[in-house]
Amino acid sequence: MRFDLLKILLVDDNQHMRMLLTEILRALGVRQIYEAMDGAEALQVLRETQMDIIMTDLTMGPLDGIDFVNLLRNSPDSPSPFAPVIMITGHSTMRRVAEARDAGVNEFLAKPVTARGVIHRINLLIEHPRQYIRCQDYFGPDRRRRQDPAFTGPWRRQGDPGVVELQY
């Protein structure tokens, strides 16, 4: 994998965490690393430069990671609605993971982060990308991770409203 070709945006209000992630990414060979202190600053960076991957903290102010991803995915003037997002947090409760998933996060990484964890999530994004789904109340990567070979119908969930558009 050519990590040296990736453009990665780090969004975290903690400078030490951005430094740690930068060192891990540089050790992998990533050369184009951009930084933002919160979601609002990240949106500004994305208006100027297209990123391959966004790594964002969940808990930041004034615009936290969930709100940032919601804007990234759903705002009419979003600069990168299809950008893959890895959410990083020390608050990895099931509720927070579900919030991140429902906001449109591609991958979730719990703190403390390790180089192995970062590599694994980046590899998942690149080698196993998920198609994007748009339905009445969600836009983002397909939240279903398992494939059921016995499934033959168009819906996986009973009661799915409306038409689902697949976007690549």
Describe the predicted segments one by one.
Residues 22, 67, 81, 92-107, ...:
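Alpha4 helix (beta4-alpha4-beta5 surface) of REC/receiver domains from two-component response regulators
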Residues 9, 55, 79-92:
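A short, hydrophobic beta-strand element within the central beta-sheet of small alpha/beta folds
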Residues 49-55:
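Active-site beta3 strand of CheY-like receiver
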Residues 61-64, 89, 93:
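The feature encodes the CheY-like receiver
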Residues 127-168:
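CheY-like receiver
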Residues 35-44, 65:
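Helix N-cap/capping motif at the beta->alpha junctions
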Residues 15-34:
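Two-component/phosphorelay signaling modules centered on CheY-like receiver
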Residues 95, 113-122, 126, 130, ...:
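C-terminal output helix
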